[in-house]
Amino acid sequence: MTPSIGSDHANSASDEEILSGAASSSDESDYLDSGVSRKRRRTAEISQDKAGKVEPEDDDDDDDDDDDDEELKRVLSTIAAPSRIKRNVPGDKKEVQAKPVVAPKNTIQAPTDPNTTFSALDVRPWLVQSLENMAIKRPTGIQKGCIPEILKGRDCIGGSRTGSGKTMAFAVPILQKWSEDPTAIFAVVLTPTRELALQIFEQFKAISSPQSLKAILVTGGSDMRTQAIEIGKRPHVIIATPGRLADHIRTSGEDTICGLRRVRYVVLDEADRLLNATGPGSMLPDVEECLSVLPPATERQTLLFTATITPEVRALKDMPIKPGKQPVFVCEVDTQTLAIPATLKQMYIKVPVTHKEHYLHTFLLTEANVDKTVILFCNRTSTADYLHHLLRMLEHRVTSLHSKLPQRQRIDNLARFRASAARILVATDVAARGLDIPEVSLVINYDLPRDPDDYIHRVGRTARAGRKGEAVSFVGQRDVELALTIEKRVGRDMEAWEEEGVNLETRVVRDALKLVSEKKREALLEVEEGREVGGKRKRTKQKLRVD
């Protein structure tokens, strides 16, 4: 039986401290937030209990320790919290079942023969050799299903788990068709993050090494004039983020963008993110701007790939067939079962929000984790920056990746992590999609994401291509509702984290409490003074004075 979140050691004194200190951290980790005092809030809860109505706590806890322990136990036992906080009742535990998804009529089932080769999919010998040079010898399920149909000229919607080889599922047929008619501009690939665009760019260059493919990268953080010149030279493939390509369409002039009007292939990688029309940071307006100058749908092939099938993507399956076009084909591999790899082990650790950093430092140094390559996800850039400072002061080999970093530093930091110069990457969700770093064996959710689909993409950075991996989520008392939502989405419960011979709470008190508290103050001071990691003051551009 899997222990329930928030109730594993309910009678221990350490757990009382955890529960009394836990607060909402679903979208932030700011332990400086102040709320209504615990004493007043408990008094209100007791009066509600007497009236027969008890509501969950809504405010963060502070450090008031005047209340009696027995009163605390009684109040906590009456809180109308989700079932995962309550004690386990024999026979009351139910398995979380993923809802079956009915596949559309035009869905193609990928071949299941494990002996299928790329040659059997009509892939040209030079491409097969390039794939073998990259240690890719047999196609994955999504590649088996998509490559033959794309070569036939059909539009595609491909859905498959993270780490299943979706990039090669569209890169291989595009390069094969390009080699038969190497015109420019042959393909445009749109993707939501700069790092993913860079990775796709590198994969296109690697697989096309026997040929003279000219591919360019068009992303934010780089000089627009240089990019405009490169676009004007008519490369064969453009890999871009929609925001920067839309900027060129609006400002770079017809001479620069006229080549886009003859594109043969348009790829929307991570289509669920690109087509999301809700919430801040929607990329849909920029995507529409990009599509406005590309050939109409009847004159190009459109390929959509995603790990999470959203309503926006699903709606495209039922669009009417345009005259002169073959029906859109849909290839979904394993999307009707679990949304995460079977080789991924999901776990959680109960932590008080006031001591998350202490638990993190201690957890990273346990015998099982001290040598692992780790991606640590946060919800905010400020949290990622702060943790980068803190973990470096605690002598961890760490780097960071988030949107507030200059593009050059983002590239350098990711390169350090790939080269194992840093074993920990502190990142926001810019690193959650598409990045393929085989050495990553552990993903930590320092903050639980609000959207369960973001959780799927985060934990998908490990356990890729059949390898094993672990994902550990830090769960505060008020994160339980969110954790349950995530479990329902992925179709599997999280297990309580355990390591033989390790009591995390004891180690926190014994080894980390004083040390981490001191380093927290130093890290916060560095961040407040605007210093770089390591203590140097950040350089700022200064205007030249003309005397």
UniProtKB/Swiss-Prot annotation:
InterPro entries for this protein: DEAD/DEAH_box_helicase_dom, DEAD_box_RNA_helicase, Helicase_ATP-bd, Helicase_C-like, P-loop_NTPase, RNA-helicase_DEAD-box_CS, RNA_helicase_DEAD_Q_motif
Biological process GO annotation list?
A: rRNA processing
Q: Which residues bind ATP?
A: 160-167
Q: What is its EC number?
A: 3.6.4.13
Spell out the Basic and acidic residues composition-biased ranges.
Answer: 43-55
Q: Which reaction does it catalyse?
A: ATP + H2O = ADP + phosphate + H(+)
Q: Which UniProt keywords apply?
A: ATP-binding, Helicase, Hydrolase, Nucleotide-binding, Nucleus, Ribosome biogenesis, RNA-binding, rRNA processing
- The segment(s) forming the Helicase ATP-binding domain are 147-327
What protein name does the entry list?
ATP-dependent RNA helicase DBP8
Origin organism lineage: Eukaryota, Fungi, Dikarya, Ascomycota, Pezizomycotina
